[in-house]
């Protein structure tokens, strides 16, 4: 787990004498790795690692130091083990409830057993399910998936929204019937504008993305950031890319936006520390 520090300037939330810290733990593409990976794997970086019990223990330790930490998943916690095959996501969701996730973005594998099953999982979950660039109003997911959620920590408002890749070609047609894909860039612009508006008033905006990293001639996190502004942090997934350190992409205003992604199976997770200070 890496320790990342970001400083985000806000206009009015703090005096010059004070600075507030937000802590985020992020996972992606854990793919139903409920049990640790086999200790017999040739890849010694993976052998015997991961597993939900380890993550639970780590989160317990982190919450002792940071009681108000936020916990996000960037998609594809589904599919990859007999637990998912047999129980169709119920095991994973119940364990994520135990871990006290705040929000997840829909990845493509969340649709592997269709939207009826996904609706069942959402109903048993205790966290928000996000996707700002899909319209599910003609499906059983209507009103169950939100474009964003607003969290508050120490009088700081954090807007968190999700982006899902185009599911055509990634999920069976019958499993996504009625779901309408919307352009991620335009969707992000609209939701960021709403989150930054006076009526919502977010101080920080975080994107949970399952678009992927370095997707050749396809929509990905770099393309998203380059064509938008107002996003402070992108937490990514989908391509199973492991960042040894944060990557930075210039947004439409020329500002560097940090991006994180942590491989797959939950072998690694991310920890972001955001220091919020006033802009004087």
What is the predicted role of each segment?
Residues 1-21:
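Bacterial Sec-dependent N-terminal signal peptides
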Residues 19-280:
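Acidic, metal/ion-coordinating pockets
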